[in-house]
Amino acid sequence: MALDIHAHRILILDFGSQYTQLIARRVREIGVYCELHPFDMDDEAIREFAPKGVVLAGGPESVHEADSPRCPQAVFDLGVPVFGICYGMQTMAEQLGGKVAGSELREFGYARVDVVGKSRLLDGIEDHIDADGLFGLDVWMSHGDKVTKLPENFHILASTPSCPIAGMADDARGYYGVQFHPEVTHTKQGGRILSRFILDICGCEALWTPSKIAEDAIAQVRAQVGTDNVLLGLSGGVDSSVVAALLHKAIGDQLTCVFVDNGLLRLHEGEQVMAMFAENMGVKVIRANAEEQFLNNLAGESDPEKKRKIIGRTFIDVFDAESCKLDNIKYLAQGTIYPDVIESAGAKSGKAHVIKSHHNVGGLPEEMNLKLVEPLRELFKDEVRRLGLELGLPYDMVYRHPFPGPGLGVRILGEVKKEYADLLRRADHIFIEELRKADWYHKVSQAFVVFQPVKSVGVVGDGRRYAWVVALRAVETIDFMTARWAHLPYELLETVSGRIINEIEGISRVTYDVSSKPPATIEWE
């Protein structure tokens, strides 16, 4: 019988914290499957899920306010360990008979907590040991309320001067709470604390590994698809590339990919996609060269949102035209990943299993009547990348910087023209090439060039010329929700600027974007 990699599982209940998905990613990194559900998950669904442990995540509410969210009683009836983090600790304390109150001194940012009690959760885990033998942890706090009275059978685990109950434990039941956030990297021992809870206290086995995920996904696809044929829109991005590699391994020639070349791709990207999948891996790929159709449809349009819609509609038209030429297609494959599923389920719905379809490809003709296959829908982006490596995709493809769906169409400000796209492609290629040479490509989260439809005077030899302006953009970010501009070395910027101006006729000036997000967005349009 095949190994069930979902057998040992953790349930995470979301109370609205910005860090909740990070908890799930940390649990997966430990090697254990987990799912994220709204705090008001149905009691029957909780029992059916049958977790080996439950994590109550943080949230922005105050436990002592009316109508603030509560943990379902079914969680405490399961008889499994429970770990409350921040708000999760507070609601657990209040629901089990303790008390929570607003704190005069709020704690946001770094803090040191003293470990003052023995417990299975924290024993042997520390950042400091004082001369008097007191253990200390460097942690990240983000709270305005605090537990003021322990529930029955709990003891104090950790404290700070302003938060005497910064951690609590009931070892007999395996119930623990901490006021700090072990899931963020600022809490230095956070990984060890979560690992202690998941592996030792809950007794989970680390079954969730890239090799086992690949085996399981291949088996699931074969079981779902059988001998039917599958269609995939291949973009060259990480998600669709991993889906293509996975499906090819699972069902071989039953897979057909349609690669739409819209004329707004990076330099040589179309050739690279065809070389990787069609030539090296033997995947059936139909390349639709639709540059002229896209550029004609975009002619005269300068509004960013309208450009996006035109590109999206044209993609659907081209994809539909190609897919209608194919016979006996029963399934449409999509690169839906777990964050898409979480967002679709919606907080406070209590019905996380009722997920709307993600039409990554768009409105396919109803007469095709295709069923969906979404082999990545349980995976976070970092897991998708690791799966890609496991399936044999090259590191540089799997860890390539994000590229917007509309491609260069939103990196050319204003109207999109072939001349602009050709200049931008070459400038972007030089920037990325120099980042790689200087070992900066993987130090930044995203880097690209933006074409600005304004001309600036330049000097070439003894003459003056008016030519176009481009901007370099490089950012550092963890989640792409906020980002800071990357402080690239001046020498590197000088090299990039010199090459672009000297090698590309038609560009006379290079600028560097030093805007962070917020207030600026990462992309210019």
UniProtKB/Swiss-Prot annotation:
Which CDD domains has this protein been placed in?
A: GATase1_GMP_Synthase (cd01742), GMP_synthase_C (cd01997)
* Location of the GMPS ATP-PPase domain: 208-400
Name the pathway it acts in. Purine metabolism; GMP biosynthesis; GMP from XMP (L-Gln route): step 1/1
Give the GO cellular component terms, alphabetically: cytosol
UniProt enzyme class? ligase
Entry's EC annotation: 6.3.5.2
Keyword check for Isomerase, yes or no. Answer: no
User: Domain of life, per the record?
Assistant: Bacteria
Identify the Gene3D superfamilies for this entry.
Answer: 3.30.300.10, 3.40.50.880, HUPs
Binding positions (ATP): S235, G236, G237, V238, D239, S240, S241
Q: Name one Pfam family in it.
A: NAD_synthase
List, in alphabetical order, the Gene Ontology terms for molecular function in this entry. Answer: ATP binding; GMP synthase activity
Keyword entries, A-Z: ATP-binding, Glutamine amidotransferase, GMP biosynthesis, Ligase, Nucleotide-binding, Purine biosynthesis
Q: Give the protein's function.
A: Catalyzes the synthesis of GMP from XMP.
Quaternary form? Homodimer.
Put simply, this protein is called: GMP synthase [glutamine-hydrolyzing]
Q: What organism is the protein native to?
A: Pseudomonas syringae pv. syringae (strain B728a)
- Gene transcribed to yield this protein: guaA
